[in-house]
């Protein structure tokens, strides 16, 4: 990893936001100086940037934050927009036709003129922590927000794990061309040898009290500190981020940044450290205890074929069970079955549960694409798709593109789906894909099907924006 701007760091300010708790480490230093650490991995450039941030005049930051655009429902959009007229949802997901892009650009110009957002006077790094509860357990996840060179996938410096669709990229590119500002960070994961990156962030933050606290719309807690970091600490960071990054969430945003860079380059050569060459990214250690991947279950609005269990016999061992009536017992029973299964098929009429376990070395009946490794075929979404959904339920690629299958990571939503269609639907529960599998397949150049991973919680939009013009 090449670290640009790694010289003397001083605290910019201790900005007090009433009721805010986003953990942001502001590391001050000139952006044009570069130090290099050599490793065997392809290395993108990595540098601080002059972030554009809300000022206290805009209101409490907990009324300004929003999730990324692609997880905001219409109801959530209305609720967020009503909290504050400057909520980031008005930028990320403006309503209307193509005129909405220019309207967002006008918002940003007006907010700057009114002192509601200000750009940091010098390049910064931002350290960001989220605290949340998952399955009854408290988690904390910490990452560094920085500018990472936006290189094509072929470079190997930043690696994808799933495919993208053209529609969202076209939308994001129009927004970027109109505003010249990246609104939300790409979520990246990096290998953290011996926990050095986590140790680094803990050390530079130290025991300082947070500048403030905030609770997001989803109920997650955020904290931030303005912390001074010296050049010694900055030089330490370079070798800790000396390997490829892996996209956890934000593939469309990353590809949009590459497309914008190419579009902007047609207007003239860009200097090596021009902001347009980079994408704002939050980098989280792969072994961070707070790195949570939720499963994404498949909801099929079709009744199970009459002979599906017999037809599964060649490739799967099947364990049948009765679904408990009590909600707590039901959840516990399903989790226990999933722990030793590739998938669990669930019907509410007659409340049957079938745990499916692929037999070692068994071939799947579906039309498995050629050229893939056994590691790719072994992940739950692929076992289900090519071993069950395609050959037995008749779910084709066209059906998937048409949205025949619904998806959810919430068991309550799964049960509601089935209860609304008694005897006419089936749900398939999956285990979460492990981060080791995500990185292993990315290293092999193999991408997972869409809706394979759900990294939780989503990064907040509105902590810091990334202007692309110096």
Residue map of PLM features:
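Detector for the Zn2+-coordinating histidines of canonical Cys2His2
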Residues: 13
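Surface-exposed, charge/polar-rich loops and edge strands
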Residues: 39-470
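Cationic, amphipathic, low-complexity segments that mediate targeting or membrane/lipid association
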Residues: 6-9
């Amino acid at each position: 990893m090449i670290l640009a701007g790694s010289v003397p760091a001083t605290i910019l300010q201790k900005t007090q936001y009433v009721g805010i708790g986003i953990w942001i480490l502001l590391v001050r230093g000139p952006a044009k100086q570069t130090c290099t650490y050599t490793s065997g991995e392809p290395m993108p450039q990595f540098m601080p940037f002059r972030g554009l941030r809300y000022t206290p005049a805009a209101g409490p930051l907990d009324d300004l934050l929003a999730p990324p655009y692609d997880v905001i429902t219409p109801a959530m959009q209305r609720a967020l927009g009503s909290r504050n007229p400057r909520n980031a949802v008005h930028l990320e997901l403006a309503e209307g036709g193509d005129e909405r892009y220019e309207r967002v650009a006008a918002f940003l110009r007006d907010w700057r003129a009114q002192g509601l957002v200000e750009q940091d006077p010098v390049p910064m790094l931002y350290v960001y922590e989220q605290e949340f509860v998952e399955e009854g357990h408290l988690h904390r996840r910490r990452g560094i927000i920085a500018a990472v060179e936006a290189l094509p996938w072929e470079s190997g410096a930043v690696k994808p794990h799933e495919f993208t669709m053209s529609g969202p990229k076209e939308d994001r590119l129009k927004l970027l061309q109109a505003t010249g500002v990246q609104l939300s960070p790409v979520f990246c994961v990096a290998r953290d040898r011996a926990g050095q990156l986590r140790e680094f962030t803990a050390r530079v933050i130290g025991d300082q009290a947070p500048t403030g606290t905030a609770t997001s719309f989803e109920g997650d807690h955020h904290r931030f500190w303005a912390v001074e970091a010296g050049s010694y600490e900055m030089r330490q960071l370079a070798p800790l981020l000396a390997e490829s990054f892996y996209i956890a969430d934000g593939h469309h945003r990353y590809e949009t940044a590459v497309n914008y860079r190419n579009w902007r380059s047609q207007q003239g050569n860009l200097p090596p450290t021009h902001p347009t060459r980079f994408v704002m990214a939050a980098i989280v250690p792969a072994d961070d205890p707070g790195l949570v991947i939720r499963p994404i279950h498949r909801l099929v609005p079709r009744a199970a074929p009459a002979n599906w269990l017999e037809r599964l016999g060649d490739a799967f061992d099947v364990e049948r069970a009765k679904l408990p009536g009590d909600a707590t017992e039901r959840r516990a029973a399903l989790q226990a079955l999933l722990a030793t299964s590739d998938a669990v098929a669930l019907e509410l009429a007659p409340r049957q549960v079938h745990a499916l376990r692929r037999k070692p070395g068994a071939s799947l009946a579906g039309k498995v694409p050629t050229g893939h490794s056994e590691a790719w075929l072994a992940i739950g979404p692929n076992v289900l798709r090519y071993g069950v959904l395609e050959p037995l339920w008749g779910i084709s690629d066209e059906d998937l593109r048409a949205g025949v299958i619904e998806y959810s990571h919430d068991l309550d939503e799964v049960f509601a789906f089935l209860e609304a269609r008694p005897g006419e639907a089936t749900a398939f529960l999956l285990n979460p894909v492990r981060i080791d599998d995500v990185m292993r397949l990315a290293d092999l150049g193999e991408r997972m099907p869409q809706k394979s991973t759900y990294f939780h919680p989503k990064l907040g939009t509105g902590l810091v924006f990334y202007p692309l013009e110096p």
